[in-house]
Each structure stands twice: as structure tokens, then as C-alpha cells.
């Protein structure tokens, strides 16, 4: 049987696979903020990125290893294709972390071997032990993944896994890369590996999966029943295409249904010992942080963290909940950290109160960033009576969004009405602090603003999404705008919040433009789609 650590290890890949969501690119400070919150959440492993992809990715993984990795903290992991260049870059990036891991992979399905790698099974069987052994010579903790395991021939899969373990892999990850399998099939796949790989007792079995058919969480729970003890997941389930298995859903399923899962761990059914090391009261805070920084809105009916997850509209349900919450709620909202504000903030609140509340929300700002955030807070407090946590999150997420921005929005003015041609004038500051102004007309005030900004920036792009939502309730609520721009097949997101939605739209557009410029200057490799160095030689 596979090695059993006695509980489920949570491997968070929000910063790697989650960031591969279209338009969800994060800068260094945003990645660091999320990594710090993941450590507070109590995940076992943080996959901080793909270091070989670009200098920016390398630096982000290295900074996270330096500032988040610790003797008592999470393992800091980097992804590497099965090639020496990738693996060496990964080892160098995670080196500052006392607890570090290299996660290397190669495809094992015939369709990937034929059309992507152009390798035979024999060639892959030669590459795997060589590259795993090389990784093991650089770090003590190596994870190996069989990409597209769900569509791989079982006998070949068993042989690859056995070779990887013999070469030094201590974790074997089984990905359902395209979200194709059903729970019964995935459970049988894990059980087959557990039964047919002779040295599987030397490694922890891990699973990774995508939600293309909406089955990722169900597949993972079935895998746990069949011996998987590490789950690779993301906050809010973000990720490529339909996303990854959602961390919050997996953790809470194991928490709420502990009596059901305990026997699969050799425990008494009523054992109170948690099945994961996650601090569930940090879940809501982490979800909001990731949503704010990526600009990816959580759907209202999303399990555990959606706005409606604990809302009751039916009169019968409301009556039952008022009498006893257990009548219609299987999860106490407080268990996932959904509580009322403990500090009421307003125009008379001081810097210390704001800093304390931001720290509770998971933001550890530098002195300079705190000064800027406090100035924004005071400005908002002059227009809004009560400042909520969501308002603070909106302020700070915008603050950390563009630390090295090419453009800064200085002024936006619009003129519009039922009998007026919508006109906008905008002023930008460039990197040298020089002001540039432009005016434009459009079909509406936001269109006019975007046209003026495009004229100033001169960066070709296509606006593919504009959305606005209320951050909180009330007529004085802030409006949060998300904008996505597309260029050369890539999406770049920007978001901003203001009590004036036109101003918020202008700032969001500028933030998206800055990401577009940064992305053009620092292109990155995709770990699965881009050609790998091993295509040239199996010994690289």
C-alpha cells in the first residue's frame, strides 16, 4: 500500500496552475500576499510557480521560498518539466526554503507521447529515472507526475511510477489533466496503482485534476477512499479551462463528513482528529484575497465561499434556521471564518486600527504601502459612512496590483447625459512622471474613457470583458470594476473599486494595460503547451 501520513496533505497550486486561468496573472507582491495567507491557512505544500518559465516566475518562487518557507511552515515547491534546465532552475529557486520540493513531470498517455512529445514509451521510461535522480541529487523531496494519467495505459503507467520511485521520488502524483474520468474510474485507477506498483509503499499517492465535467472534487474524494493522501487543489477552484478541484470544497467535505471518511484511514468512525491540517476559519479570508487579487469573481452559489452559500430565501427555510441552524445548514458559517466585523471603521478611525484590521484580513503591508492605503481609506471615509472589510480589501488589492506600473491614472473627467455625446478626458503619468492628456468620445462614458486611454497608451488590444458589481450594500457602496484585455491570444485583467464606477473603470483599464505591457516585456513559458527541451534529447 502507498505510504500513509495518517491524514490528507493539502498541496495548493493556486500560484501555479491557478494562475494559468485566462487573465489571472499575478505580480510578485500579489503572489507573496497569497502565499503568506496560504501559510496562515495551514496548507502543507505551496506550489509557488514554474521557475523556468521566465525571470519573473523564478524571482517570485525564490521570494516566496525566502519569506514564506520556514522550518514549521509549508513546503515550498516549484514545477519543472523532465529536463535538466527546468530542474536546475527549480532547485535554485526553492533553495532558500528549509523545506523544499521539486515537482517534475512527463506525459504518459499515448496521445501525448505521439503528438506532443514525439517519444516512444521506451524513451519515456529512460527519461523518467534519469530526471528524477537528477532532481533527487539537488533536493531531498521530489514529486513526480504522470501527465494525463487518466488516459494512460495502466501497465505502462505502473512501470513509469515504479521507475520514478526507484530513482528517488517520494510523492507520486496522478493527474486527470483534462478532467475526463468519472469518480468510479478515478478511484479504480488509484486502487490499481496501489495494488500493482511493487514499491508504492515508499511514496505518498497524490492526485491532481481539472473540472471540465464538474467532477474534480468527487474524483478526489473517491481517490482518498482508495489510498490517495495528497490532494492538489486551488483556492476557489481557479485554473485552466473549467478550473481545478476547489480546496475549500475538499477540506470542508472531509471536515463535515469526517465520520464517513475516518474508517478509510484506519480510525474509529467517531475519531475527532481532523483529516487535514487546514485552519478552516481562514478559508473565507483566503477566498476573498485570491478573488480580489486575480479579479476572478466567485459565483454567488459557489459551495462554501459563495455569497449565497449561507443565505436562505425560502420562508420555510428561514423559519427553520431561526429555530435551529442545523435544520438547513450542514456547515456553521463561523467554521469557515464568515463572521461579522469586529472593528467598526469610519472617518475617525486611525492608522493603527486600519493596520490591525488589514493584518487580520491577511495583508502585511510595508510602511509605504500602508501610508498609501490609509490615504485611500480616509478619502473613501469622507464619502462613505461605514467602511467594511470588503471595502478595505478592494482598496488594498488595488494598492498591490501595480507596484511598478508604466502608467498611473491622474485624472478622469466625463460629460454625458440623455442629450449629450459622451466625452471623456483622461490624464496619465508615465514612468518619468510626465503628464499626458487625451480626450475622446464614445457610445457611453466608459467607452469614451477606454478610447482616450488607448489613444494615450498606443498598445493594441481588444476589450473582451467589462463587469461591475457592488462591493457592499447601500447607495454609497463602492463599485468594483473588472476589465479584461486580449492581445495575441493572451488575456490581461485589471480591477479597481471606487464610489464612482467611471473612475473605477478608468483605473481598472489602466491596471489591465500595465499588465499587458509587463506581459509583453516578460513572456513566460507554459509548462504543458510549450515545447520542452527534452524534445531534442532524452539526456538533456
Swiss-Prot record:
Its EC number is 2.3.3.13. It catalyses: 3-methyl-2-oxobutanoate + acetyl-CoA + H2O = (2S)-2-isopropylmalate + CoA + H(+). Residues 8-269 form the Pyruvate carboxyltransferase domain. Its cofactor is Mn(2+). Pathway: Amino-acid biosynthesis; L-leucine biosynthesis; L-leucine from 3-methyl-2-oxobutanoate: step 1/4. It is found in: Cytoplasm. Keywords: Amino-acid biosynthesis, Branched-chain amino acid biosynthesis, Cytoplasm, Leucine biosynthesis, Manganese, Metal-binding, Transferase. GO terms for cellular component: cytoplasm. GO terms for biological process: L-leucine biosynthetic process. GO terms for molecular function: 2-isopropylmalate synthase activity; acetyl-CoA C-acetyltransferase activity; manganese ion binding. The keyword Amino-acid biosynthesis applies. Residues 408-540 are annotated as: Regulatory domain. InterPro entries: 2-IPM_HCS-like, 2-isopropylmalate_synth_dimer, AIPM/Hcit_synth_CS, Aldolase_TIM, LeuA/HCS_post-cat, LeuA_allosteric_dom_sf, LeuA_bact_synth, PYR_CT. Its main location: cytoplasm. Pfam families: HCS_D2, HMGL-like, LeuA_dimer. Mn(2+) binds at residues 17, 208, 210, 244. CDD domains: DRE_TIM_IPMS. Homodimer. Belongs to the alpha-IPM synthase/homocitrate synthase family. LeuA type 1 subfamily. Catalyzes the condensation of the acetyl group of acetyl-CoA with 3-methyl-2-oxobutanoate (2-ketoisovalerate) to form 3-carboxy-3-hydroxy-4-methylpentanoate (2-isopropylmalate). This is 2-isopropylmalate synthase. It comes from Synechococcus sp. (strain WH7803).
Amino acid at each position: 500500500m502507498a505510504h500513509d501520513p495518517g491524514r490528507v496533505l493539502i498541496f495548493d497550486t493556486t500560484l501555479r496552475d491557478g494562475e494559468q486561468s485566462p487573465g489571472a496573472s499575478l505580480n510578485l507582491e500579489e503572489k507573496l500576499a497569497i502565499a503568506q495567507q496560504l501559510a496562515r491557512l495551514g496548507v502543507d505544500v505551496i506550489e509557488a510557480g514554474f521557475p523556468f518559465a521566465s525571470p519573473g516566475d523564478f524571482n517570485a518562487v525564490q521570494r516566496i521560498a525566502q519569506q514564506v518557507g520556514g522550518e514549521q511552515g509549508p513546503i515550498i515547491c516549484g514545477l519543472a518539466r523532465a529536463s535538466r534546465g527546468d530542474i536546475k532552475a527549480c532547485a535554485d529557486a526553492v533553495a532558500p526554503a528549509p523545506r523544499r520540493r521539486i515537482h517534475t513531470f512527463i506525459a504518459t498517455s499515448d496521445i501525448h507521447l505521439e503528438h506532443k512529445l514525439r517519444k516512444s514509451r521506451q524513451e519515456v521510461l529512460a527519461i523518467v529515472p534519469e530526471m528524477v535522480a537528477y532532481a533527487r541529487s539537488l533536493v531531498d523531496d521530489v514529486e513526480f507526475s504522470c501527465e494525463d494519467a487518466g488516459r494512460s495505459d495502466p501497465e505502462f503507467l505502473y512501470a513509469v511510477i515504479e521507475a520514478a520511485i526507484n530513482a528517488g521520488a517520494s510523492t507520486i502524483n496522478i493527474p486527470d489533466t483534462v478532467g475526463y474520468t468519472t469518480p468510479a474510474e478515478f478511484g479504480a485507477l488509484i486502487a490499481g496503482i496501489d495494488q500493482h506498483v511493487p514499491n508504492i509503499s515508499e511514496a505518498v499517492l497524490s492526485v491532481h485534476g481539472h473540472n471540465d465535467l464538474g467532477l474534480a472534487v468527487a474524483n478526489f474524494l473517491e481517490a482518498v477512499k482508495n489510498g490517495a493522501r495528497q490532494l492538489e487543489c486551488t483556492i476557489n477552484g481557479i485554473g485552466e479551462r473549467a478550473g481545478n478541484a476547489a480546496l475549500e470544497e475538499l477540506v470542508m467535505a472531509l471536515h463535515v463528513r469526517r465520520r464517513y471518511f475516518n474508517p478509510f484511514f484506519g480510525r474509529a468512525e467517531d475519531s475527532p482528529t481532523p483529516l487535514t491540517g487546514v485552519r478552516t476559519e481562514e478559508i473565507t479570508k483566503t477566498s476573498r484575497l485570491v478573488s480580489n487579487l486575480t479579479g476572478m469573481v466567485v459565483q454567488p452559489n459557489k459551495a462554501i465561499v459563495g455569497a449565497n452559500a449561507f443565505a436562505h430565501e425560502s420562508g420555510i427555510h428561514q423559519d427553520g434556521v431561526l429555530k435551529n441552524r442545523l435544520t438547513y445548514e450542514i456547515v456553521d458559517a463561523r467554521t469557515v471564518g464568515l463572521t461579522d466585523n469586529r472593528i467598526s471603521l469610519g472617518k475617525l478611525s486611525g492608522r493603527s486600527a486600519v493596520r490591525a484590521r488589514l493584518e487580520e484580513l491577511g495583508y502585511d503591508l510595508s510602511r509605504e504601502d500602508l501610508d498609501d492605503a490609509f490615504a485611500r481609506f480616509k478619502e473613501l471615509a469622507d464619502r462613505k459612512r461605514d467602511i467594511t472589510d470588503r471595502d478595505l480589501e478592494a482598496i488594498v488589492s488595488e494598492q498591490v496590483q501595480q507596484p511598478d506600473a508604466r502608467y498611473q491614472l491622474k485624472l478622469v473627467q466625463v460629460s454625458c447625459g440623455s442629450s449629450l455625446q459622451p466625452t471623456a478626458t483622461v490624464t496619465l503619468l508615465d514612468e518619468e512622471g510626465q503628464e499626458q492628456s487625451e480626450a475622446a468620445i464614445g457610445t457611453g462614458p466608459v467607452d469614451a474613457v477606454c478610447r482616450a486611454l488607448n489613444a494615450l497608451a498606443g498598445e493594441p488590444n481588444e476589450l473582451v470583458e467589462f463587469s461591475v458589481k457592488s462591493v457592499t450594500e447601500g447607495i454609497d457602496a463602492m463599485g468594483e470594476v473588472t476589465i479584461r484585455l486580449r492581445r495575441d491570444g493572451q488575456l490581461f485583467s485589471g480591477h479597481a473599486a471606487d464610489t464612482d464606477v467611471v473612475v473605477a473603470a478608468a483605473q481598472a483599464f489602466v491596471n489591465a494595460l500595465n499588465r499587458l505591457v509587463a506581459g509583453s516585456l516578460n513572456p513566460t513559458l507554459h509548462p504543458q503547451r510549450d515545447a520542452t527541451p527534452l524534445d531534442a534529447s532524452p539526456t538533456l
